UniProtKB/Swiss-Prot annotation:
Domain of life, source organism: Eukaryota
Protein name per Swiss-Prot or TrEMBL: Protein FAR1-RELATED SEQUENCE 2
Family to which this protein belongs: Belongs to the FHY3/FAR1 family.
GO cellular component terms listed in the entry, alphabetical order: nucleus
Length: 807
C-alpha cells in the first residue's frame, strides 16, 4: 500500500465548519433536518464538514462515534481517506491473568462512515453502514464526545477561553489585573471578545516587561508550544533574553481560539502595549498562519522559524515516506548544517529530495520556499540569543517549561506564574549585585577575554569564556584566498570534526560553519583562532553586542530626551516608565531603596509647591496607562469589589538586600514552587518542575493519550454583554460580566516527538553543525565557495546599529 495509516483528531481542526443542526427547545436531543439524506455518494466541501454532519447524525440517533483511522497521500502528504466508527466498534482484549475482568461496552459494531477525497478536493461518502448490533443508548454520544457521562442538556457550546477556564478562573484573572493596576500604573491588559460577547483571548503586560522590552527587543520569541501541544491552560508568552542570559517575559496571552483573527489581534495589541516599537527579529513556530500574520503586522521585521519546530514536524509530515533507518535524517542534517553558499544548499537539497522521492511533497516545497527563515546559512548578520536551536529542551525558551503542567488547573498555573515572576526578579537582583561587586577571573592571556570581561555581564562573559580553552584544541589551515576573503579549515580535535571560517579582512567579518554567533550571540573558538591568526588584537565591534553588556538594561529610547509633552496622559505614562527604571536600580540594596524613597518624597513636595493647582484630582481625567482605550458604555464596568467581595489579607513579606539574602530568597522560592507544583495533577507525561532553573534537563515529553475534562454549566453572575465591542483594552476597574460561560469542551493533549538527527545536530543550543565525521565534503565545499562579500549574503542584517557596542 502506498499510504500509511495515521490516527488523527479532527475535533481540534474544525472550528470554522458550520454545524448543520440546532438544539431542540427541550434540550434533550438535537434535531437535524438533513440527517435523513445521509447516503453513499454525498459530497462535502471538506472532511471537517463531513465529520460534523455525521456527528450530528449520531447525536440525533443516539450513539457515540470515534475516528477509527485515516490515510495520507504519499505524493502530497494530504489526507485522502477517513474512517469514522461507532464508539462500540472492536472488542475487548481479555488477559488470561485477569481475576475479575471488567465489563466492556465494545460489541464489535460495524456501523460507521468511510469517506474519501476526490480529485476536485471535495470529500465523498464512500461507504455508509447504518445498522448497529446493539441497543441505542443516547448517553453513548456524550460519553464519546466529552469523556464523561453528561446529560444531553449539558452539551451547550463553549468557545474561546471558556473551553479552558472556569468562571472562577476568569474572576481570579481579572482581580489580578485590577490589583496589578493599583501597584503598577504602567500595567496593560486587553480582552478579546467574539461576536457573541464571550471572552476569546486575553493579553497582559506588566511595567517591568515594558522596561525590559526597551532593552531586549532585538530578538523576541512568540512561543505557542503550550497551545500547540494541548496544555489545559493555553499560555502563549512573548519571550526575550536579558543581558544576564535570563528568560524574560515581554508579554503574556491566553489563547482560546487559534485563528487568523486571534493572532492579528494579539500581535497588534502587543505592538500597541510596547509603544509601537516592533522587534528586530521575531521567532515563531513553522506555521503558515503565523507567518502570514507576522508579515502583515510586522512588515519590516526579520521572521525566523524555530529550528526545533521544523525538526519536530519531520516525523509528522514525512513519516509515511521516509524512515530513520534509510539515512534521510543524516542527509537532512548535513544539508542544513554544513551548506555554505546558496548554490551549495540548493544543490544538496535537490539531491536529497530526489533521492527520497520528495520532489512533489507540498510540505517539503514549503520548507524550501521559506529556507531563509530556518536554514542557518541565511542567518548571517543576526543573533537569536539562545532562543532557537535543534532542541527546545536545551534552549532558554524552555526555562518556563519547569513551571508548566499539561493538566494543571488555572489556579495552579497562576500560583506558579507568580512564583516565577518573583524568582526571576530575585535572580536578576542577585546577578546585578554580583557583576557590580566582583570582577571575573581570567583563564588565559587572550586579549579578547580581558576586553570582554570589562564589558559583559558575568553570565554573558562566562558563555564567551567557555570558548577560550577550546582554541588550543583547534588547528588552522588556509584553504584558499580571493581578494579580501579567505577560507580557513579548522580541525577541531575536541569535537572531532572540521569547521570552516570565512574571514573578510577589510570588515574583519568571520563567519563560521558552527553558527554559534548566529544562535547564541558569542564568537566561537574557531572564529577566535582565525582572528588571532590575522593579528586582530581586539574583538571587532560587530561581535560585541550591547544586549550582553553591563548596561544592557539601561537603554535610552528616543522619548527619554525630555521633549515637552502637552497631554497629561502621555506625561503620566512617561513618568511611570521612568519610575520603573528607578525601581529596578533602587531595589538592588536597602540603602539605595531608602535614598530613592527619600528623594521621591522631596520631589513630590517640590512639585506640589510649584503649582498649587497641581493637586491630585479625585475625579476627572481618569488615568489609563499603556495606551489603552475605554468603552463607550461605562455602565458595563464597575469597581473591583463587585467582582469579588472577599477580604484580601496582606501577608508580611521579608526584605532581601544583599547577595546572600537574594540567594536565600531564590532557594525559598524554589521550595515554594515545588510545593505548589506538587498539588497539581501528576501524570507520567507531565514535564515535572526541576529545582535547578539554570540548567534545563535534556528530557522530552512523552507522547500521551487524549485527556478529557469538562466543566459544570453555570451562568450565575455572568450575564451576556450586548454593549461591549469585540476588543477591550483594560484599564477601567473591572468587567462586571464576561459573557455566557457555559458548556463543555474536549481537549486532546498531543506532544510532538522530535526525530533523532542521528548526530547531525549535536543537541546543542550553540548549534555546532554536523557532528558526523566526514560529513563535510571539502572538495565540493571549496569548489562551490564564491569569494567576496556576496558569498555570505543569506539575508540583510536585522540588527539596528544601536544594538551593537563599539570598542
Amino acid at each position: 500500500m502506498d499510504d500509511e495509516d495515521v490516527e488523527i483528531d479532527l475535533l481540534t481542526k474544525s472550528s470554522n465548519v458550520d454545524v448543520f443542526c440546532e438544539a431542540s427547545t427541550s434540550g434533550n436531543v438535537a434535531q437535524c433536518a438533513t440527517v435523513s439524506e445521509l447516503r453513499n455518494g454525498m459530497d462535502f466541501e471538506s472532511k471537517e464538514a463531513a465529520y460534523y454532519f455525521y456527528r450530528e447524525y449520531a447525536r440525533s440517533v443516539g450513539f457515540g462515534i470515534t475516528i477509527k483511522a485515516s490515510r495520507r497521500s504519499k505524493r502530497s502528504g494530504k489526507f485522502i481517506d477517513v474512517k469514522i466508527a461507532c464508539s462500540r466498534f472492536g472488542t475487548k482484549r481479555e488477559k488470561a491473568t485477569a481475576i475479575n475482568p471488567r465489563s466492556c461496552p465494545k460489541t464489535g459494531c460495524k456501523a460507521g462512515l468511510h469517506m474519501k477525497r476526490k480529485e476536485d478536493e471535495k470529500w465523498v461518502i464512500y461507504n455508509f453502514v447504518k445498522e448497529h448490533n446493539h441497543e441505542i443508548c443516547p448517553d453513548d454520544f456524550y460519553v464519546s464526545v466529552r469523556g464523561k457521562n453528561k446529560p444531553a442538556g449539558a452539551l451547550a457550546i463553549k468557545k474561546g477561553l471558556q473551553l479552558a477556564l472556569e468562571e472562577e478562573d476568569l474572576k481570579l484573572l481579572l482581580e489580578h489585573f485590577m490589583e496589578m493596576q493599583d501597584k503598577q500604573p504602567g500595567f496593560f491588559y486587553a480582552v478579546d471578545f467574539d461576536s457573541d460577547k464571550r471572552v476569546r483571548n486575553v493579553f497582559w503586560l506588566d511595567a517591568k516587561a515594558k522596561h525590559d522590552y526597551c532593552s531586549f527587543s532585538d530578538v523576541v520569541l512568540f512561543d505557542t508550544f503550550y497551545v500547540r501541544n494541548g496544555y489545559r491552560i493555553p499560555f502563549a508568552p512573548f519571550i526575550g533574553v536579558s543581558h544576564h542570559r535570563q528568560y524574560v517575559l515581554l508579554g503574556c496571552a491566553l489563547i482560546g481560539e487559534v485563528s487568523e483573527s486571534t493572532y492579528s489581534w494579539l500581535f497588534r495589541t502587543w505592538l500597541k502595549a510596547v509603544g509601537g516599537q516592533a522587534p528586530g527579529v521575531m521567532i515563531t513556530d513553522q506555521d503558515k498562519l503565523l507567518s502570514d500574520i507576522v508579515v502583515e503586522v510586522f512588515p519590516d521585521v526579520r521572521h525566523i522559524f524555530c529550528l526545533w519546530s521544523v525538526l519536530s514536524k519531520i516525523s509528522e509530515m514525512l513519516n509515511p515516506f521516509v524512515s530513520q533507518d534509510d539515512g534521510f535524517m543524516e542527509s537532512f542534517g548535513n544539508c542544513v548544517a554544513s551548506s555554505w553558499t546558496d548554490e551549495h544548499f540548493e544543490r544538496r537539497w535537490s539531491n536529497m529530495i530526489g533521492k527520497f522521492e520528495l520532489n512533489e511533497n507540498e510540505w517539503v516545497q514549503l520548507l524550501f520556499r521559506d529556507r531563509k527563515k530556518w536554514v542557518p546559512h541565511y542567518f548571517h548578520g543576526i543573533c537569536l540569543a539562545g532562543l532557537s536551536g535543534p532542541e527546545r529542551s536545551g534552549s532558554i525558551a524552555s526555562h518556563f517549561d519547569k513551571y508548566m503542567n499539561s493538566e494543571a488547573t488555572f489556579k495552579d498555573f497562576f500560583e506558579l506564574y507568580m512564583k516565577f515572576l518573583q524568582y526571576r526578579c530575585d535572580v536578576e537582583a542577585k546577578d546585578d549585585l554580583e557583576y557590580q561587586s566582583k570582577q571575573p577571573t581570567l583563564r588565559s592571556s587572550l586579549a579578547f577575554e580581558k576586553q570582554l570581561s570589562l564589558i559583559y555581564t558575568d553570565a554573558a562573559f562566562k558563555k564567551f569564556q567557555a570558548e577560550v580553552p577550546g582554541v588550543v584544541s583547534c588547528q588552522l589551515q588556509k584553504e584558499r584566498e580571493d581578494g579580501t576573503t579567505a577560507i580557513f579549515r579548522i580541525e577541531d580535535f575536541e569535537e572531532r570534526q572540521n569547521f570552516f571560517v570565512a574571514l573578510n579582512n577589510e570588515l574583519l567579518d568571520a563567519c563560521c560553519s558552527c553558527h554559534l554567533f548566529e544562535y547564541q550571540g558569542f564568537l566561537c573558538k574557531h572564529a577566535i583562532l582565525v582572528l588571532q591568526s590575522a593579528d586582530v588584537s581586539r574583538v571587532p565591534s560587530q561581535y560585541i553586542l550591547k544586549r550582553w553588556s553591563k548596561k544592557g538594561n539601561n537603554k535610552e529610547d528616543k522619548n527619554d530626551k525630555c521633549a515637552t509633552i502637552d497631554n497629561r496622559m502621555a506625561r503620566f505614562d512617561d513618568l511611570c516608565r521612568r519610575f520603573v527604571k528607578l525601581g529596578v536600580v533602587a531595589s538592588l540594596s536597602d540603602e539605595a531603596c531608602k535614598t530613592a524613597l527619600k528623594l521621591l518624597e522631596e520631589t513630590v513636595k517640590h512639585c506640589v509647591s510649584m503649582d498649587n493647582s497641581s493637586k491630585f484630582p479625585s475625579e476627572p481625567d481618569k488615568l489609563m496607562t499603556g495606551g489603552s482605550i475605554g468603552l463607550e458604555n461605562e455602565g458595563v464596568l464597575d469597581c473591583a469589589s463587585k467582582v469579588s467581595k472577599k477580604k484580601k489579607i496582606q501577608k508580611k513579606r521579608k526584605v532581601y538586600c544583599g547577595p546572600e539574602d537574594a540567594t536565600n530568597r531564590s532557594e525559598e522560592l524554589r521550595q515554594e514552587t515545588e510545593q505548589v507544583s506538587s498539588r497539581a495533577p501528576t501524570f507520567e507525561n507531565c514535564y515535572i518542575p526541576q529545582a535547578n532553573m539554570e540548567e534545563p534537563e535534556l528530557g522530552s515529553r512523552a507522547t500521551t493519550l487524549g485527556v478529557y475534562y469538562s466543566t459544570q454549566q453555570t451562568n450565575q453572575g455572568f450575564p451576556s454583554i450586548s454593549s461591549i465591542q469585540n476588543g477591550y483594552y483594560g484599564h477601567p476597574p473591572t468587567i462586571q460580566a464576561m459573557g455566557n460561560l457555559h458548556s463543555i469542551h474536549e481537549r486532546m493533549s498531543q506532544y510532538e516527538t522530535q526525530p533523532s538527527m542521528q548526530g547531525a545536530f549535536q543537541g546543542q543550543t550553540g548549534f555546532r553543525g554536523s557532528a558526523i565525521r566526514g560529513c563535510y565534503d571539502i572538495e565540493e565545499t571549496l569548489h562551490d565557495m564564491t569569494m567576496g562579500s556576496s558569498q555570505f549574503q543569506g539575508s540583510d542584517s536585522s540588527h539596528p546599529s544601536d544594538h551593537r557596542l563599539s570598542n
